[in-house]
Amino acid sequence: LVASQVVMAPIHLLAAGGSVGRRLGAVGGGLVVNSGQWDGYPDERERLLGLLARRPGGALVLSGDLHSSWVSQLATEDGRGAPVAAEFTVPAVSAPTFARALAPKVWGGRSVLERAIRRANPHVAWVDTAAHGYLLLDVTAERVEGRWWHVDRVGKRTDAERLAATWSVTRGDPRPFDGPAES
């Protein structure tokens, strides 16, 4: 397990293209949009992923700071190389979400934003840009299972929550898969 305060997976919004990319503030020439994440440190990310690639058994990176829920596949060569780790990104508990910040700038809102993210980032297996919540991990020697629990309201006391997704990764295979791992 590797903990990272910020998201390690490359996030390409430039490739989202057209009006979506422009409305999100994308710039041309390959400049990164999200330079406060690992995207701003591509050489360092490549070195770390290279180290993870040399360790047998795969790895799982836990990250945050995007205020949304993501499951990504990490690979060397800016995502074009062999898979070396999965990444589980936790949502915000109460801070404004990724969708709240960006979806109003996109015609069609959240659903168009999430489709554009997935289209431009094939290494992103799942994303929910709008929900608040938390991630609950179940870790054994053979697998890690993550359950994203989301809440519909913040700012008002309630114990209502819902299971939004379950993703897992098993020892020896760095690719995340949808659903619980077999014990």
Please state what every model-predicted region is.
Residues 1-183:
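Long, structured stretches of catalytic cores involved in phosphate-ester chemistry, encompassing
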